[in-house]
Amino acid sequence: MTDAGEATPVAELIASLTRQVPDFPKPGIQFKDLTPLFADATAMTAVTGALARHASGADLVAGIDSRGFLVAAAVADRLHTGVLAIRKGGKLPPPVHAERYDLEYGSATLEIPADGIDLRGRRIVIIDDVLATGGTLAAAARLLRRTGATVTAAAVVFELGALGGRAALAPLPVHRLTCQ
């Protein structure tokens, strides 16, 4: 069966199990809470399988703090690869590789260990739960590339298409399981 044929049931599972939270974390934002999706065994298995197809060929899967860890670890297990946790700033002991990026109001930092893991030449797919503006995923890709890794793609469960995040990642291929 093709990806297109399999995407509809996965997209339906995602839609049925995504909790819409108005005005969170601030007024005017419609937060997409994927917690019920991750807690459902059938849905989590379907999401993991679909993301794993997009990550095939990677020798390491990277997940972004914190919900990206959930799906990245499951995908890495399915692909028999390792998983790399890309952490928010200040969560790892030094030394770290860090990448600062801008948010709507301020900035943030992503970090990975600077020793103990050699990423040079590793083919990495970055996985996260939601693609919004693309700032976090773009920063993660820059961070990994600076270590000598080859970032081959990004894959997300849910894309908020109206926010244009895909453009921030161009020309990196971005795979999504559903879009709103």
From Swiss-Prot:
Record-linked CDD domains: PRTases_typeI (cd06223)
One GO term of the biological process aspect: AMP salvage
Entry GO CC: cytoplasm
UniProt-recorded Gene Ontology molecular function terms: adenine binding; adenine phosphoribosyltransferase activity; AMP binding
Subcellular localization, as worded in the UniProt entry: Cytoplasm
Main subcellular location: cytoplasm
Enzyme class, broadest EC rank: transferase
Gene: apt
Organism: Mycobacterium avium (strain 104)
Annotated protein name in UniProt: Adenine phosphoribosyltransferase
Domain of life: Bacteria
Record has Transferase as a keyword: yes
Record EC number: 2.4.2.7
Keyword Glycosyltransferase listed: yes
Quaternary structure note: Homodimer.
Free-text function comment from the UniProt entry: Catalyzes a salvage reaction resulting in the formation of AMP, that is energically less costly than de novo synthesis.
Family that this chain belongs to: Belongs to the purine/pyrimidine phosphoribosyltransferase family.
Family matches, as InterPro entries: Ade_phspho_trans, PRibTrfase_dom, PRTase-like, UPRTase/APRTase
Pathway in which this enzyme or protein is active: Purine metabolism; AMP biosynthesis via salvage pathway; AMP from adenine: step 1/1
Alphabetic keyword roster: Cytoplasm, Glycosyltransferase, Purine salvage, Transferase
One family name in Pfam for this protein: Pribosyltran
Catalytic activity annotation: AMP + diphosphate = 5-phospho-alpha-D-ribose 1-diphosphate + adenine
Gene3D superfamilies for the chain: 3.40.50.2020
